[in-house]
Amino acid sequence: GHGTLDAGAMLVDAKVSSPTSGDTFNADATGSAGALIGVTATQTELFVGNESTVSNSRDMIVRAGVDSNQSIDVDGAIDIGSNVNFTADIDSSAYAGGLVAAGAAISRVRAQLRSEAYLGGSGSVNAGSLSVGASSDPKLVARATAGSGGVFAGAGLETLTEINSSVRAMVGSVPTSDSDASSWSSANNKSINITGIEGVTISANSSNRVNGYGEVFSGGA
């Protein structure tokens, strides 16, 4: 922007939040076969990002920032924060009950995300305190159960959990590309004057949690 900002406080916040109960994303698939010769297979896939086509997938981008070449004068706090927090739980179950049965269960969940917070531009900053923080805390769970109850039994399963994340907090630089997480402008020299005891906090934190659970069972005659 090109206008001078004079305010008591400033908050810039961008977030993806989990619901108070349950998962943000979930998917389930169940297959069963009870014929004399039974074959059943189930597959569940979930992609969390900007494109559902994995071959052409792009990051989910959550971004909070200020880009100003003019002065920013705030009596109190300047808080700029970006947070990604979601859960994804998918389940694939295949059960086969024929005398000669084969079943496979495939469960795959992937996430690509960027959490970015920045204070850019060349304008001076005067504030009581300054906080620029980016964080991410996704949790992915993939579950697969495959079973067969025939005399000649075969069953297989696959679980895949994958997170590709970038978390960045910057002062003096701004992001320049939605497709390249490493593409940021050259840093500007900024004059920052902080008058309060809270000072300046610049933080980037990421906690990626993944779990895969698989069970295969078969029974004889």
Task: Spell out what each predicted region is.
Residues G1-A221:
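Low-complexity, glycine- and small/polar-enriched segments
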